Design a protein with these regions (language model features):
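Active-site core of glycosidic bond-cleaving carbohydrate-active enzymes
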Residues: 19, 28, 299-532, 540, ...
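Extracellular/oxidizing-compartment recognition motifs
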Residues: 1-293, 302-303, 319-320, 339-344, ...
Length: 553
């Protein structure tokens, strides 16, 4: 269990009374996704506080049953579904965190007895998650046929919350804020200006503010939730809001961008812009997630296995990744395998290419930051992980029956050979292990590096025998994915490389009209093709009469 440390010195004055008030809400674990998941329902796991106040390094105050507690103005909160805030309760609790407040009617706190209360505490040792920027609306409109709603467009998908200021509403009225990344559009509905929330699935992404009826106006900023959105729909205000009263507060773990990349192409610059925003919007509470908006928002390892290099190049990820790696070690299965998402709900082996996140992060920190610390700190856990890979390899009938898992997730067309795709993960992991074990100073690291190199040589030979079609001159069934993976690994025999590469480029240009997509393929296609001379194309089929151009132009 992670804890945070705060220096309160600047908030204290000698001889002046001081009070400490803390608000607690549901976290990631409790009050989570819709029914059907393994997270507890709202209220089943009440929030807990563990606090120690030190003066000059000596404990002077601990959280115990002498503390007082009461229900707050936040009547409901969920990371996925939003927050409900009753400003009438807040008014009745005015001054609750200030000296002199009368808490005699409050109940005593109850000592926690759950397993979580005995969890080992560890310092977060990473940047905090905070509001990092404020964005004004770019435009606002009223959806067709819905005069009671206002939709504000912030012009950028982001993770965060929306702040309202100077809100005019009658006491007891509810003002709702619904969040979405898109407006309704065909084929999902008419372009009427309403929010499209189909991609949110079970996540409600709705904040509700119950007004106290202050004639001077009311302000609201959600406390214990976060949404992925570009648009917000506000409903229930007695007086329509102006753009100046609405602001988006961008949120993420406060990693700093430490590099920039610019092209002469506006399209490529926009692509890099999307990469930057997509990455930082998915670093929340130190966990790299799959999405900031729908009812998942978990630390899916496959996403990071593909993006760790990008992340460490664009942002200072050392602290976040180092802390997250500890959870990989905590959640490691008994056979050495890693999970499909971390933190995991139990220990189980994940899919090939998803498990690869563990070595991929260690390798990225070592390769781009020169950081040996992760490889050294995780040496034993990584050695068990490579024991697990070796067991999978030995049981795979020379890779022909290697573990499959998800394969090449969401391909634009047929799925490639899953055994081939799984075997790629094995070889990539072995390449990375040979690198970072080779640079580690941990006892036994050089022996681990030698093991990785030996297994890599054997598995590379098996890969070619198992998956290369000699008669047709390509791997597997000829799909792009099946070619770029061995090309990227550098395991295609040199005499065959030009033919495999030519087949790949022809497939990209003609079969898919210069289209490259899907998860694993995207990791490998562009870097592979950018290093290769483009061969002369074969004539394009009439279905795709496009003139040839380099696939990486």
């Amino acid at each position: 269990m992670l804890y945070s440390t705060y220096d309160l010195t600047a908030h204290l004055t000698p001889g002046t009374p001081a009070a400490l008030g803390i608000a607690l809400g549901n976290g990631w674990w409790s009050c989570g996704p819709p029914p059907g998941t393994s997270q507890p329902a709202c209220g089943a796991a009440p929030p807990q506080l563990r606090l120690q106040l030190q003066v000059d390094g000596k404990p002077v105050l601990l959280s115990d049953a002498s503390w007082r507690a009461a229900a707050s103005a936040i009547t409901y909160n969920s990371l996925y579904n939003g927050e409900h805030y009753d400003a009438r309760t807040a008014a009745a609790l005015a001054g609750w965190a200030a000296p002199g407040f009368d808490d005699a009617a409050w109940a005593h706190a109850v000592a926690a007895t759950s397993a979580a209360s005995a969890a080992q505490m560890s310092s977060a040792l990473m940047e905090p998650t905070r509001h990092v920027s404020v964005r004004a609306p770019r435009s606002a409109h009223v959806p067709a046929g819905d005069a009671g709603a206002q939709v504000f467009d912030f012009g950028q998908n982001m993770a965060g919350v929306v702040r309202l200021t100077g809100l005019r509403c009658v006491a007891g009225a509810n003002v709702t804020l619904r969040h979405a990344e898109l407006l309704t559009h065909p084929p999902y509905g008419a372009e009427d200006g309403s929010l499209y929330v189909g991609n949110l699935r079970g996540a409600q992404a709705t904040d509700v503010y119950t007004c106290r009826g202050d004639a001077n106006g009311e302000d609201y900023t959600p406390h214990f939730t976060q949404h992925g959105f570009r648009y917000v729909e506000v409903r229930g205000a007695a007086v329509p809001l102006t753009d100046e009263q609405v602001a988006a507060l961008e949120m993420h773990t406060d990693v700093q961008q430490h590099s920039s990349l610019a092209f002469s192409s506006a399209r490529l610059n926009q692509l890099q812009h999307l990469v930057l925003w997509g990455q930082k919007s998915n670093i929340m509470s130190g966990v790299p997630t799959d999405c900031p908006q729908r009812d998942e928002r978990r630390g899916w390892t496959g996403d990071v296995a593909l993006t760790a290099e990008e992340a460490v190049l664009n942002y200072g990820m050392g602290a976040v990744y180092s802390r997250w790696l500890k959870q990989f070690a905590d959640d490691q299965a008994t056979d050495g395998g890693s999970n499909n998402f971390v933190p995991a709900l139990g220990t189980a082996d994940g899919s090939p290419n998803w498990q690869s996140a563990y070595p991929a992060i260690v390798w990225a920190l070592y390769t781009y930051y020169g950081d040996r610390g992760a490889a050294e700190a995780h040496h034993n856990s990584l050695a068990r992980y490579y024991d697990h890979l070796e067991q999978l390899y030995r049981a795979s009938a020379n890779l022909t029956a290697y573990a499959i898992g998800f394969g090449d997730w969401v391909p634009a067309g047929p799925m490639g050979n899953k055994h081939l795709i799984g075997a790629f993960a094995l070889l990539r992991d072995l390449q990375m292990g040979a690198d970072f074990f080779g640079g580690s100073r941990a006892a036994g690291a050089l022996a681990q590096a030698a093991r990785c190199r030996a297994l890599l040589a054997a598995a590379a030979a098996d890969f070619h025998v198992a998956f290369f079609d000699v008669a047709k001159g390509y791997y597997g069934s000829g799909l792009q994915t099946e070619q770029v993976l061995p090309l990227r690994l550098g395991i295609v025999p040199e005499p065959l490389r030009p033919k495999v590469l030519a087949h790949t480029i022809d497939d990209i240009v003609y079969t898919h009209s210069r289209h490259i997509t899907s998860a694993i393929r995207t990791l490998t296609s562009t870097p592979t093709l950018s290093l290769a001379p483009a061969p002369a194309p074969t004539p394009a089929p009439s279905l795709y009469p496009h003139p040839y151009s380099s696939p990486c132009s």
